């Protein structure tokens, strides 16, 4: 009797548009099409890294319910239009860019003054309409992130450093616009009870649909490898590792995997903190003594660790493990 599960392979990747593709994978054992299709779809929609405007300061505007003379849109619609711009940062995690234009005319994304390593994927996106005498002068902060972060959450976290007149935006970082999947019947030789998984993926241009599904699969593998590392309780004698010698694989991952800001990451490396296991053993007071690492960076580190069920000041009995690369 056949006991090995069939391993699927990608049959075809069909480009429907510049940013949309259909990926067909088969064969799957019966039921695995829905199992993996749903998991991939959820990861694609929630866990892809992208870029979004997170904060804006507009000359003459104190809050989002204001209006500007000579600008057709009110500030609320202006902010909605700003959030529709698709940014791509090449070598940094955040940037502050400027937009200055006088009317009459249409203000589009290509009017933004960009550094050499920042790209706009939809330069014709309309931001505002200016009449004669109208003027638009703003600073936009763009950051790297994952998923969706409401503005009020970011505002509370940054309350101590908030500047009057700076408007915090809801940030949708995900570069994946739409994902759908369908499961069809497939056949291999005499077996007709197999699944074919058809996924349709649309992105905003920051990454291709093919790259998106590769990243989603890597995230799933990275999450599931922890379960594969579980030791059987039936192993006994010298073959059974002691509880104290077993280290959570999460702690052996580099701090770069936490996706901290460049400033925070560089401060940690300057203190020879290369792994998550190194980091969680430090206390808040120890980190605050690190040059250039302030309260804001400390809060960022604490939030990132908390999202993974970790915290500062933890004790590890068997750290560093013998197999940890120096």
From Swiss-Prot:
> EC number(s) per UniProt?
2.7.7.6
Instruction: Tell me the keywords, alphabetical order.
Output: DNA-directed RNA polymerase, Nucleotidyltransferase, Transcription, Transferase
Which top class of enzyme applies to this chain? transferase
Q: Mind listing the GO molecular function terms for this protein?
A: DNA binding; DNA-directed RNA polymerase activity; protein dimerization activity
Which InterPro entries does its entry note?
A: DNA-dir_RNA_pol_insert, DNA-dir_RNA_pol_RpoA/D/Rpb3, DNA-dir_RpoA, RBP11-like, RNAP_asu_C, RNApol_insert_sf
Give disulfide pairs as residue numbers.
none
Region annotation (Alpha C-terminal domain (alpha-CTD)) ranges: 247-326
Q: Which GO terms describe its biological process?
A: DNA-templated transcription
Q: Which reaction does it catalyse?
A: RNA(n) + a ribonucleoside 5'-triphosphate = RNA(n+1) + diphosphate
UniProt keyword Metal-binding present: no
**Which residue ranges does the record annotate as region Alpha N-terminal domain (alpha-NTD)?**
1-231
- What Gene3D superfamilies does the record tag this protein with? 5' to 3' exonuclease, C-terminal subdomain (1.10.150.20), DNA-directed RNA polymerase, insert domain (2.170.120.12), RNA polymerase, RBP11-like subunit (3.30.1360.10)
What domain of life? Bacteria
Tell me a GO cellular component: cytoplasm
Entry comment, domain topic: The N-terminal domain is essential for RNAP assembly and basal transcription, whereas the C-terminal domain is involved in interaction with transcriptional regulators and with upstream promoter elements.
Q: Which family does it belong to?
A: Belongs to the RNA polymerase alpha chain family.
Subunit-level organization: Homodimer. The RNAP catalytic core consists of 2 alpha, 1 beta, 1 beta' and 1 omega subunit. When a sigma factor is associated with the core the holoenzyme is formed, which can initiate transcription.
Q: Summarize the protein's role.
A: DNA-dependent RNA polymerase catalyzes the transcription of DNA into RNA using the four ribonucleoside triphosphates as substrates.
Protein name, as recorded: DNA-directed RNA polymerase subunit alpha
- UniProt gene name: rpoA
């Amino acid at each position: 009797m056949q006991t090995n599960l069939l391993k699927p392979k990608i049959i075809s990747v069909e480009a429907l548009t510049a940013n949309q593709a259909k990926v067909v994978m088969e064969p799957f054992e019966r039921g695995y099409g829905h199992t993996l299709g749903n998991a991939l779809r959820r990861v694609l929609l929630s866990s892809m890294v992208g870029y979004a405007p997170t904060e804006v300061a507009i000359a003459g505007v104190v809050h989002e319910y204001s209006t500007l003379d000579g600008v057709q849109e009110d500030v609320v619609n202006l902010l909605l239009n700003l959030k529709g711009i698709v940014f791509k940062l090449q070598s940094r995690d955040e940037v502050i860019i400027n937009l200055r234009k006088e009317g009459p005319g249409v203000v589009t994304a290509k009017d933004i003054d960009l550094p050499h390593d920042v790209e706009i994927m939809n330069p014709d996106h309309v931001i505002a309409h200016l009449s004669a005498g109208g003027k638009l002068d703003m600073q936009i902060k763009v950051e790297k992130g994952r998923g969706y972060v409401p503005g009020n959450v970011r505002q509370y976290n940054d309350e101590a450093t908030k500047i009057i007149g700076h408007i915090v935006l809801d940030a949708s970082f995900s570069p994946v616009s739409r994902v759908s999947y369908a499961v069809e019947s497939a056949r291999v030789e005499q077996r007709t009870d197999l699944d074919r998984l058809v996924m349709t993926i649309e992105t905003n241009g920051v990454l291709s649909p093919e790259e998106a599904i590769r990243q989603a699969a890597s995230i799933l593998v990275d999450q599931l490898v922890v379960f594969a590392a579980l030791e059987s309780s039936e192993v006994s004698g010298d073959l059974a590792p002691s509880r104290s010698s077993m280290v959570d694989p999460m702690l052996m991952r580099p701090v770069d995997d936490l996706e901290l800001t460049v400033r925070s990451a560089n401060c940690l490396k300057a203190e020879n903190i290369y792994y998550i296991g190194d980091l969680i053993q430090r206390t808040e007071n120890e980190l605050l003594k690190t040059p250039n690492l302030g309260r804001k960076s400390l809060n960022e580190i604490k939030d990132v660790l908390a999202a993974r069920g970790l915290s500062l000041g933890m004790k590890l009995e068997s750290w560093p493990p013998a197999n940890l690369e120096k």
